[in-house]
Amino acid sequence: DIQMTQTTSSLSASLGDRVTISCSASQSIGNYLBWYQQKPDGTVKLLIYYTSSLHSGVPSRFSGSGSGTDYSLTISBLZPZBIATYYCQQYSKLPRTFGGGTKLEIKR
């Protein structure tokens, strides 16, 4: 199985900040990477598919980039509703596998 690693498990930032969350794969996944947002209430939403394509209804403050084994999700102008845990998922090879998640919190 392909192992997905999110080295930062938690991240604290201020409102208005630009935040980047990283994800790496144990082998090249050819841009077959999605990003998901899980809110504190458990709601899960697809944000980005195929590395950089914004899912319908997702604010343009969210963007994705990367290639090969290294990928990132960037949130510009952080807003309160962005507080969540973010997961990368590869679908280059079955089984689909997820990173361990990065929990984003507001710095007080």
From Swiss-Prot:
GO biological process terms held by the UniProt record: adaptive immune response; immune response
Region (Framework-2): 35-49
Region (Framework-4): 98-108
Residues covered by region (Complementarity-determining-3): 89-97
Name of protein: Ig kappa chain V-V region MOPC 173
Region (Complementarity-determining-1): 24-34
Disulfide bonds: 23-88
PANTHER family per UniProt: IMMUNOGLOBULIN LIGHT CHAIN (PTHR23267)
Residue span of region Framework-1: 1-23
GO CC list: immunoglobulin complex
InterPro entries: Ig-like_dom, Ig-like_dom_sf, Ig-like_fold, Ig_sub, Ig_V-set, IgV_Light_Chain
SUPFAM superfamilies with a match to the protein in the record: Immunoglobulin
Residue segments, region Framework-3: 57-88
Pfam family, one: V-set
Annotated spans, Complementarity-determining-2: 50-56
Keywords: Adaptive immunity, Disulfide bond, Immunity, Immunoglobulin
Organism: Mus musculus
Something else known: This chain was isolated from a myeloma protein.
